[in-house]
Amino acid sequence: MKLVQREAEKLALHNAGFLAQKRLARGLRLNYTEAVALIAAQILEFVRDGDRTVTDLMDLGKQLLGRRQVLPAVPHLLETVQVEGTFMDGTKLITVHDPISSDDGNLELALHGSFLPVPSLEKFSSVGVDDFPGEVRFCSGHIVLNLHRRALTLKVVNKADRPIQIGSHYHFIEANPYLVFDRQRAYGMRLNIPAGTAVRFEPGDAKTVTLVSIGGRKVIRGGNGIADGAVNRSQLNEVMEKVIANGFGHEDYPDSSEGIIGDGTHDYSVDHEKYASMYGPTTGDKIRLGDTDLFAEIEKDYAIYGDECIFGGGKVLRDGMGQSAGYPASDCLDTVVTNAVVIDYTGIYKADIGINGGLIVAIGKAGNPDVMDMDGVNEEMIVGVNTEVIAAEGMIVTAGGIDCHVHFICPQLAEEAIASGITTLVGGGTGPAHGTCATTCTPSPSHMKLMLQSTDELPINMGFTGKGNTTKPDGLAEIIKAGAMGLKLHEDWGSTPAAIDNCLSVAEAFDIQVNIHTDTLNESGCVEHTIAAFKDRTIHTYHSEGAGGGHAPDIIKVCGVKNVLPSSTNPTRPFTLNTVDEHLDMLMVCHHLDRNIPEDVAFAESRIRAETIAAEDILHDMGAISIISSDSQAMGRIGEVITRTWQTANKMKRQRGRLPISSSPDAAEDNDNFRIRRYIAKYTINPAIVNGFSDFVGSVEVGKLADLVIWKPSFFGAKPEMVIKGGAIACANMGDPNASIPTPEPVMMRPMFGAFGGAGSANSIAFVSKAAKEAGVAVQYKLGKRVEAVGRVRGLTKLNMKLNDALPKIDVDPETYTVTADGEVLRCQPTPTVPLSRNYFLF
């Protein structure tokens, strides 16, 4: 066959398309992925038929599927489909705009060549939808651009025989010599139009334009070099001599009117919807997160309206305009993420994010201080010739997720994790050994060395926990000094009060965290005895509800204990119709149980309780459970930590209403910001605090590693657009590598340069104990990763958990399993459907 890579990838596209055809033939309405696959694959088949042109196929692609053949969200998710195929005259790009543009498609064309039966259109119901994924609800009012700047009007005539287009931030005095206007008045001025737009002068055109003064230090660079330097009226005669000497069109315009932007005579204003179409939503606008019912309202926008950083042809970030000239690399950003809506536990706001040396060095307004107002452009956020741009207009940026309950059963879990937006993994294991399949322990120093070395080039921060189940300290110091950044107590190794006490004593000496999976059997005691064994010392309780393991039926009581830092694992997130039914077999496999042994079955069944799973939902919403993690391949799904967090938040909004920001219902705002901040903290800052590395990762804050995830709002929580790891793009949606542009199908999450060679280690951290760092494991193991010590975890309490510090008194009825918090029964119904699911995923 001699297949090249692009052919192999197109085969995968064809398989997805054929799968979609089979589902369509059964009368199923297609989701986003299926619709894209079917359209792209069919276009390639029509290319092979050889009797249609590119233009023909661009039109035909819009005829295949209608709104009734796809799920209601799909027309809003699917804007274009692009694919490249081999025509008789070579490889060509076909772009289908608005591919779902009619009520019914042509199903004969959609199934052409498949030999599948064409279903009746009666199989497809018409379901309208008022809400759509990623929708923006705009604030009323208008935004005035370049407010308080000096402004004037000029007449401009194009004397050329070609069109001339001038961008918003081009120094107008430097414009094309064939444009005739009053260049003296234009000194130090630019167009008063939205940033990144332009005015086009056709041959012979005469237009009146409004100019505004440049901002900042008022320094002109670039263009034709006519007025190079600081704007200084005393030098204007010299500048005008250059204008005339170099043949630049100039004509006095005494009819010019002058004023100040804001006085109403020279203003340029846009409404919020128009503004968002160019730069993304701004203060007061609300964004639907994916297809959930959660709305994030932008609380603050650091932009200076009219001076936004926009990259592209004729846009703002060009030499002498938004990009500064004359600044060394040391004064400029390595990378700037522009116009991002940041969703973080610290707030929901819009800003540029500046990255240097892999760290977030500033958040605010980036650009060129020579032409942009100094009260806007942060001195740490200068864009220069050494700066790369990641355009995030209309996008959401979050901190990279942290999964702090990982069974390292297979290395491929790292690929799944980063593709979902997880950038830090904490747990233990050695591969698919039975101990690892059940417990997160990396037991021996040789295992620890193996795991740190084997994950060294992965573009993910790593931390490994040793086994803590022993009643004597012997052996624990060795694994800690070998690199363990924490210890794990697991019932499969014996989580007895004696082992708990000893493990915590050693952890206190080394300032590391202890994670515990308690005793489901109640063999050495019940939950109150385990709590007593803690002796008020800090401990992190895994799957604190109990389905993942722990004292039956009331381990959930620990969520009301001050020194306990509770977390959940994601199979029970949220409580759905099928949650209970899937768990028994999951548990039997993970814990090496035998369904032929009655006691093993009873052990498994005792852990699965609908009542406590339902209560877990509500405790999360109250902020009484602080973390959500995966329990990867050991009763958990590593690629769904983020998705299931937002599914839980959405379920709680639907069942409990808007979350008030205080005890008074009247304090609820007309948005979901508080709930959103509470839930994002569960997989970002709180696991970072619990594990002792919040100085390095866990939030979008200055000084932290630039581990950032970029999302399209319509795909938020389901599928990221790009994952930035330590300032480098490590994973991103990328199309056909042979294509003329990056977007033709098949588009998939692929590793980028930040994940290859030594880049993965250079942009990531290996977290170890202080003792291990001081012992020099970085050198001993020849690690490329930056090695950092965890710390300040002993003495943490629930009150240190951001936005998740509630301490209700929890009781569980041992017979009915009814859970109460401060006397209130915690009860909710399982949901039959969740968002971030069927609209997005193929399987």
From Swiss-Prot:
InterPro entries: Amidohydro-rel, Metal-dep_hydrolase_composite, Metal_Hydrolase, Urease, Urease_alpha_N_dom, Urease_alpha_subunit, Urease_AS, Urease_asu. The keyword Hydrolase applies. Ni(2+) 1 binds at H405, H407, K488, D631. The active site is at H591 (proton donor). Pfam families: Amidohydro_1 (PF01979), Urease_alpha (PF00449), Urease_beta (PF00699), Urease_gamma (PF00547), Urease_linker (PF18473). SUPFAM superfamilies: Composite domain of metallo-dependent hydrolases, Metallo-dependent hydrolases, Urease, beta-subunit, Urease, gamma-subunit. Binds 2 nickel ions per subunit. Keywords: Hydrolase, Metal-binding, Nickel. GO terms for cellular component: urease complex. Its cofactor is Ni(2+). One of its GO terms (biological process) is urea catabolic process. It catalyses: urea + 2 H2O + H(+) = hydrogencarbonate + 2 NH4(+). Pathway: Nitrogen metabolism; urea degradation; CO(2) and NH(3) from urea (urease route): step 1/1. Carboxylation allows a single lysine to coordinate two nickel ions. Homohexamer. Other oligomeric forms may exist depending on pH and presence of salts. In the C-terminal section; belongs to the metallo-dependent hydrolases superfamily. Urease alpha subunit family. Urea hydrolase involved in nitrogen recycling from ureide, purine, and arginine catabolism. NCBIfam families: PRK13192.1, PRK13203.1, PRK13207.1, urease_alph, urease_beta, urease_gam. This is Urease. It comes from Oryza sativa subsp. japonica (Rice). The lineage of its organism: Eukaryota, Viridiplantae, Streptophyta, Embryophyta, Tracheophyta.
